[in-house]
Regions:
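N-terminal beta1-alpha1 cap of cysteine-dependent amidohydrolase-like domains
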Residues: 1-97, 105, 111, 118-133, ...
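DNA-recognition element of transcription regulators
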Residues: 140-144
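Catalytic His-Asp charge-relay segment
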Residues: 172-176
């Protein structure tokens, strides 16, 4: 399995930007797949034709919602990577910000809502073909949420009816609003979800 990850972008000093990938995400992917080859996707390595799976990782905010240069740079990178993955029909998973970015990319509403940061949320599983459970509990870290839309297939949703896990209709593009890599002990249901997405 060859996996590309788009990194978060942080401003470490005035106009000095750092590209970052959480080491826990890399460890989580090693937990899910046997000897994965992991590539960090940036402007100089945007050719993603040799990967089997693209992850738009967490971190940052959508530039249209939070006007900051680091978000502008991130959104530019993710736009190019997602367009390339769509063209080459590579499966994509957006994690947290990545899920919001994909939703926004397909013109679905993303809006600010309290109660989803550092909180354990109960996610009701609507589509059991992805996970044969009625619900799961996950820790969330996001300020923005996603509303239901005709372009999304809801797979799992929160008790406040906001979407936590979805698939773009007619495409192998998914969004997951929680961070599977942030559990101290990786959860097997997250591994099952990734395997299902890549199958």
């Amino acid at each position: 399995m060859k996996i590309g990850i788009t990194p978060s972008i942080k401003e470490i000093y005035k106009n000095q930007f750092e590209y970052c990938v959480d080491i826990r995400l890399i460890d989580f992917l090693k937990y899910c797949f046997i000897n994965p080859k992991i590539f960090i996707v940036n402007e100089s390595s945007l050719n993603i034709k040799n990967i089997n799976f693209l992850i738009i990782s967490g971190g940052n905010d959508i530039y249209d919602l939070v006007k900051h240069k680091k978000n502008f740079l991130r959104n530019q990178l993710d736009n190019k990577a997602l367009n390339s993955a769509i063209q080459k029909k590579i499966p994509v998973l957006g994690i947290c910000y990545g899920a919001q970015f994909i939703s926004h990319f397909f013109n679905n509403k993303v809006f600010k809502k309290r109660g989803h940061v550092q909180k354990i949320n109960k996610i009701i599983i609507k589509d059991k073909s992805y996970l044969n459970k009625n619900f799961i509990k996950v820790k969330c870290f996001h300020n923005y949420v996603i509303k239901a839309h005709k372009k999304l297939n809801e797979i799992g949703f929160c008790e406040d009816k906001t979407i936590e896990f979805y698939k773009i209709k007619n495409k192998k593009i998914y969004g997951m609003m929680w961070h599977p890599e942030r559990d101290y002990n990786f959860k097997n249901f997250n591994k099952m979800i990734l395997k299902r997405i890549c199958s």
